[in-house]
Amino acid sequence: MSKAWGGIGIGAWADEAERADEEQAAEATAATADTQSFPSLREAAAATATSGKSRKMKKMSLSEFTTGAYTAPGGRNSVGLTQQEILQLPTGPRQRSEEEMQPGRLGGGFSSYGGRSGGRIGRDRDDSDGSWSGGGGGGGRRPYGGGFDDDRRGNQSRVSDFPQPSRADEVDDWGKEKKPLPSFDQGRQGRYSGDGGGFGGGGSGFGGGGGGGGGGLSRADDVDNWGAGKRQAPVRSSTFGSSFGDSGQEERRRLVLEPRKVESGGSETPPVVEKTSKPNPFGAARPREDVLAEKGLDWKKIDSEIEAKKGSSQTSRPTSAHSSRPSSAQSNRSESSGLNNVVKPRPKVNPFGDAKPREVLLEEQGKDWRKMDLELEHRRVDRPETEEEKMLKEEIEELRKKLEKESVAPEIKESDQEPGSNNNHNDLPEIIRGKEKDLEILTRELDDKVRFRQKPVERPGSGAGRTGTYSERTHSRAGSIDETRSFESTERPRSRGAVDAWVRPANEQRRNFQGTKERGFFSNRSSSREGW
């Protein structure tokens, strides 16, 4: 009777179940062991708190303390080498033959390439570990790095922990067993890429690769002088190793220049400039100096004449009314610039255009700008008109009326006039000018007195004689009393029909000043205003 489970025994599934349970239990114990070896911070703190008191002190030797390796009693098992292994260890360097000691011979690893030191390094590595040579026989391919990669792999195991015999000891001359190179370029390309044999065989680290004896596919063991077989223009390869041997001068093509042609004739013709297809932005135009030189003219003289004309026109034309006459500095400057052939800058444009000063415009209109300015200044001064000013204005008006009447009917006036009165009528314009000057001087003096008068600052003991200072002055001119009165009226504070503080008796003013010596002018004014 055939079994449905394919021949599996009756208790096979039970065995498998038990085996699975055992594996799970082993995994659980491993997990707990890991957690015990690496507990959390809380568990470690709790464990130290509980077991800190019950923990006993342990004795250890000085060697154990210095090395840091403590072994429990009863567990001192020897892990080091046995006595037989210790006796097999080398006591010194291996004895080399005379041929191997010569640096120029092809006996050691890379002895001819890198000198004596390079060969020694290769020999030491071959003697120390057999992993450099690709498994001892050089049969299998290994990645770049040699035996260092074997330590990282867990599947591959070494044959023995003891050092294997080096291929450098087995082979005396690597040059006899090396394979011929296919081409020069391939050997140079594979120096670092690992296909043509730079420092080793194809694919291995520094040791053998591609079979054979010692990975000796390098041209360092074959050719002593690399410059002998060098080509003129080698093909540049895209690999990394080719950039070290190639140079820019080998790849660059040599320029083939035509020989220089020198004509036998005595006169050398100027070189013909090749015309380009790009159009000239100036067309057929040429410099002004070249054109004038072809016509036989001196362009320097022409420029100096033009500059002289410009300077004369600028100096002759007045820029404003104040500078109607040409200044000597400008004329001298224009002459010197014309002589020195210095290009003068363009004349500055007047920002005001054709605008003229106010005085010039008023004179063109027949007005006296001085009288207008005086009248404007007089309006700024706030003072009443004096009697003397009124009288002078009336006299000037009467004289002007007489002058107008004489100009309207001169014949009638001449018939009515007496023979002794001709001089008076002819002198009327001069008399009017004199009166106007007197009026102008008088108004200016009065305005200056009001404008530049000293403000009266009353001091203790001096207020008695201040009231009549302007009235007690002696004036030689008629109407001076009215002038002082008008001046006093301007200085008085304008009140609304109350008693004036400036006309108070001297005793009252003294009383105000003697009240407090600390109070000044403002305190006196405040007390005087109380009666307004």
UniProtKB/Swiss-Prot annotation:
Keyword Membrane: no
Compositionally biased region (Gly residues): 105-120, 132-147, 193-217
Domain of life: Eukaryota
Motif, Nuclear localization signal 1: chain positions: 177-184
Post-translational modification: Phosphorylated.
Stretch list, region Disordered: 16-365, 401-434, 451-532
Entry GO terms, CC: cytosol; nucleus
Biased composition (Low complexity): 26-35, 237-247, 315-337
Keyword Phosphoprotein on entry: yes
Similarity remark: Belongs to the eIF-4 subunit B family.
Identification of the protein by name: Eukaryotic translation initiation factor 4B1
Species this protein is from: Arabidopsis thaliana (Mouse-ear cress)
